[in-house]
Structures are given as C-alpha cells and as structure tokens.
C-alpha cells in the first residue's frame, strides 16, 4: 500500500484521468441542459452587454482574495515551520487550486499543497498537510458566522416553509460536521482512533489483492507518528492567539470580498440583486460546492443559483450570464495559472 506522502499526487491525477474526464463530460451535459432551459440566445444577449469596468473589477477582487489567501497560509506555515517566499507560496497555492478544480469535491488541493511543500521546500508532508488543513479551518470560521446569519435571514424571505427548513437544516448540519472535524483534528486520541480505524480497513481491503497480505502491525507505529506530527502542527496553528486573530480577520475579509465579487458579476450584466437573497444564495452555493460530485461543482451551483434567484425575481438568462462572468475570474483563470504552475513543478521534480 502506498501512502499519499510516498506517491505523487500528479500520478494520482494521471491514474484517475478517466474519472476526471467523465466528470467534466457530466458537467458539460448539466450546463447544456441549464443553458437550454434558460435560453442560449438570451444568455448570449445578456453577456454582450457585459460592462468591461465591472468585469475588470471582478478580476481585481479575485486577485485580492488570492493574495489574502496566500498571506493566511504563510502566516500558518510560519508558526509550524518556515514558510517559503510569498511568490513561491502563491504559485504553490495556484497549483493546489488546479488540483481542487479538476477533482470532484475539491479533493486534490490540500494533499497537493503538502506534497509540493515536501518536494520543493523540504517541509515534512504531515506538517504541510496540517498547515493546509488549518488554513481551511480559518476559512470555515467566518463561513459559520455567515451561514448562521443566512439561516436567520431566510426566515424573512418570501419562500415556502419547507425550503426554509431544508436550507436551514443543511446550513446547521454543515456547521456541526465541520465543528466535529476540527475537534477531531485537535484531539490526538480521537484523531489516532479514526486514522487507525481507516488504515486497518484499507490494509484489510488491499490484502485481498496482494499475495501474502499486508501486516497492519508493520505500519501501526508509522501511522501514530504521522498523526502525532499532524496533530501537533494543526493544534499549534489553531491555538496560537496571534495567528487565530489575524487569520480570522483575513478570512472574514476574503468572504466579504467574495460576496461583493458575486454582486459585481451581476452588475456586470446589468442586474442589481437584493442584498438579503444574495447573501443567502451565496451561502447555499458554497454548501453545494462542498458536495463531492462534480469538479468545481460546475453546473450544480449554477442550477441552484438559477432556481433560488428566480424567487428573487432575476431571470435564468441573467443568472447564467453572471455565473459565466464569475467563473471566468474564480475558476477558469486560476485553474489555467495553476495548470502552468503544476507543469513547471512537475518538470522541476522530474529533472
């Protein structure tokens, strides 16, 4: 059995290229269906009137968000290890965004960050993974506040009681799930128990396909060692008061800018959405992006936005046009930059 630390994440992407290709084919079908019902002609007409000023502002806001993201990760890395220079760290972040955006449920980004830190900077894998995981925790804290606000605001929205209940429950369940994950990450005994349980099952499963089987006793101590290193790094980053306060406000600023950016995307196509529905729908869109179904939740998020903004009185053609403006800056551009960075690091490590 080969661990993520010992194998290339690029190899993982290569080995799973069929699944990735099929996922993007599914994305194409979903987007085609949404576009068909919204009206391709109407969407194109909405896009033809796109304001270049707001389009440029969309890219500026996304660039600021990415800079803040790099600053937050660097802040955490400097607590658990020595962080590389800002430009190098930002390129590593772009590479991880590429991994996130081509794998369903954004499953490839955090291991890819840890892997590249080890290969390029010599940072131990478990420390790099702890830093990228802690980085996601800081992202979750303001999201939890926005989600609670959305759960309250949705009660004032003129929609069916069942829609209010479903969205509110979805928000609260997500908050509870993340809270449990953070608690498990900071509690060494629970983290060890979960890791050993998962490892034992994996060893049992792989033993069926390997002659002579695999000894669990042989990797037990190694699992404990890595979990302890991960737990120490994760806890250090989360419990450092200075890092926590600065990281929290950076994350809050990132979320505020992202909500503003979505608003700007609608302004770009000539629509001004009401503030309360925008915050609620933005939160639901983030929740949908967590589902490990399609890469980048392409199509799924658009479908949800079309349905929810219809309640706010905004037509599907304008919602889809705003989504295109949004995806150009938040998905296509970072993914292409990340692809170039991934190719660069791949060649560097090969040579």
UniProtKB/Swiss-Prot annotation:
Protein localization: Cell membrane
The entry's keywords: Cell membrane, Membrane, Transmembrane, Transmembrane helix
Signal peptide location: none
GO cellular component: plasma membrane
Principal place of residence: membrane
Family the entry assigns: Belongs to the UPF0104 family.
Protein known as: UPF0104 membrane protein MTH_887
Source organism per UniProt: Methanothermobacter thermautotrophicus (strain ATCC 29096 / DSM 1053 / JCM 10044 / NBRC 100330 / Delta H) (Methanobacterium thermoautotrophicum)
């Amino acid at each position: 059995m080969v661990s993520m630390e010992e194998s290339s994440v690029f190899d993982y992407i290569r080995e799973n290229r069929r699944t990735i290709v099929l996922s993007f084919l599914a994305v194409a079908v979903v987007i085609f269906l949404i576009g068909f019902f919204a009206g391709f002609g109407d969407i194109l007409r909405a896009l033809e009137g796109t304001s270049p000023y707001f389009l440029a502002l969309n890219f500026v806001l996304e660039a600021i968000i990415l800079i803040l993201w790099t600053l937050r990760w660097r802040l955490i890395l400097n607590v658990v290890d020595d962080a590389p220079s800002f430009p190098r760290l930002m390129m590593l972040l772009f590479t991880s965004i590429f991994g996130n955006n081509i794998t369903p449920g954004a499953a490839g980004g955090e291991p890819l960050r840890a892997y590249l830190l080890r290969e390029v900077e010599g940072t131990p894998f478990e420390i790099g993974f702890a830093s990228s995981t802690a980085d996601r925790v800081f992202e979750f804290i303001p999201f939890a506040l926005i989600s609670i606000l959305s759960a309250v605001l949705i009660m004032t929205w003129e929609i069916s009681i069942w829609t209010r209940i479903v969205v509110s429950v979805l928000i609260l369940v997500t908050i509870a799930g993340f809270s449990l994950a953070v608690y498990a990450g900071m509690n060494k005994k629970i983290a060890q128990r979960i890791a050993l349980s998962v490892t034992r099952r994996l060893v049992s499963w792989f033993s069926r396909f390997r002659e002579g089987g695999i000894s669990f006793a042989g990797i037990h101590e190694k699992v404990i060692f890595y979990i302890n290193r991960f737990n120490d790094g994760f806890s250090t980053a989360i419990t450092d008061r200075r890092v926590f306060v600065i990281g929290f406000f950076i994350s809050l600023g990132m979320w505020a800018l992202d909500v503003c950016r979505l608003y700007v995307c609608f302004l770009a196509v000539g629509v001004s959405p009401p503030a309360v529905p925008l915050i609620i729908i933005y939160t639901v869109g983030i929740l949908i992006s967590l589902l490990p179904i399609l890469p980048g939740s392409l199509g799924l998020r658009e479908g949800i936005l079309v349905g929810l903004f219809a309640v706010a009185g905004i037509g599907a053609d304008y919602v889809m046009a705003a989504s295109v403006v949004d995806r150009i800056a938040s998905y296509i551009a970072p993914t292409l930059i990340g692809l170039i960075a991934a190719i660069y690091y791949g060649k560097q490590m090969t040579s």
